[in-house]
C-alpha cells in the first residue's frame, strides 16, 4: 500500500500508517532550500520534514520516494541538493517535468524545462539507467556505485512516454481517469462504496479498450484536469 503526502504531519501519522500496512510513501519536496520550500508550500517546515524523513528511514522498512517538479529557475541548484541528499540515504528522488494544465499556462511556458538536462548530467557523471520492471511506474531511475540512493526522471513530453503506461487514476469522487490528461471520467463510486470487487473488476476491464494510446500535451491539450491536485498526481 502506498500513500502520497506533502509530509506536513509525517511524524504524527507514521505509526498509524505502519499499523495499516503502509509499505511505500511518496513525499513532495520541490526544493531543499528552506526559503523556496516555504514560498512553494506556505509552510516553514523543511528542517522538521527532513528530520522526520531520517526517522522514518532509521525506524521503518517503508520504501520512500521523493518527488519534485523540474523548474527552469531552480533545476541545477535542486539537482546539487538532491545529489547530497541521496548520497547516504536509501531514497529515490524523482524529477518530474512540469506539465501544463488549464490553470498554469503562463507559468508553464516560463518555467518548463526538459528532463534531458538532468539526464545528460547524470550520464556524464557515471550514473547508469536501470531496467524498468513490468509493473513499475513511469520513472526512469538512475543509480551510481558511490550513492546509496537513486535519482529518477518522469518525462511526459518524451517520445514514447505513453507506450508502457500501466496506470489508472481514481479520484476522491470515485471517478476513474484512464489518463491524467484525458477528456472524460467514469464513475465507479458505487462499486467502491458497496465493496463490490467483482463489479469493479468487470467495470475496469470494460474500460481498457478505450484507454487513450497517448496524451495530447504537445498539442497544448491537457484534457479536463484543471489542476493535478484534483487527482493526486
Predicted regions and their residues:
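Radical SAM/AdoMet-radical enzyme domain recognition
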Residues: 1-94
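Auxiliary Fe-S-binding modules of radical SAM enzymes
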Residues: 84-88, 98-233
Amino acid at each position: 500500500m502506498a500513500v502520497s503526502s506533502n509530509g506536513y504531519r509525517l511524524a504524527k501519522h507514521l505509526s498509524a500508517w505502519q499499523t495499516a500496512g503502509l509499505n511505500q510513501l511518496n513525499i513532495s519536496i520541490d526544493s531543499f532550500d528552506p526559503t523556496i520550500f516555504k514560498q512553494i508550500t506556505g509552510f516553514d517546515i523543511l528542517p522538521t520534514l527532513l528530520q522526520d524523513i531520517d526517522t522514518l528511514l532509521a525506524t521503518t522498512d517503508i520504501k520512500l520516494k521523493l518527488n519534485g517538479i523540474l523548474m527552469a529557475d531552480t533545476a541545477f541548484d535542486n539537482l546539487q541538493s538532491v545529489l547530497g541528499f541521496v548520497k547516504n540515504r536509501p531514497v529515490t528522488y524523482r524529477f518530474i517535468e512540469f506539465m501544463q494544465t488549464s490553470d498554469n499556462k503562463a507559468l508553464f511556458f516560463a518555467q518548463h524545462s526538459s528532463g534531458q538536462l538532468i539526464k545528460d548530467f547524470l550520464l556524464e557523471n557515471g550514473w547508469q539507467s536501470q531496467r524498468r520492471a513490468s509493473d513499475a511506474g513511469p520513472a526512469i531511475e538512475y543509480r551510481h556505485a558511490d550513492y546509496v540512493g537513486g535519482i529518477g526522471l518522469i518525462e511526459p513530453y518524451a517520445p514514447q512516454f505513453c507506450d508502457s503506461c500501466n496506470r489508472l487514476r481514481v479520484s476522491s469522487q470515485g471517478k476513474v481517469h484512464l489518463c491524467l490528461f484525458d477528456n472524460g471520467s467514469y464513475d465507479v463510486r458505487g462499486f467502491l462504496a458497496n465493496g463490490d470487487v467483482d463489479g469493479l473488476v468487470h467495470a475496469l476491464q470494460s474500460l481498457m479498450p478505450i484507454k487513450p494510446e497517448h496524451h495530447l500535451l504537445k498539442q497544448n491539450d491537457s484534457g479536463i484536469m484543471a489542476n493535478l491536485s484534483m487527482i493526486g498526481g
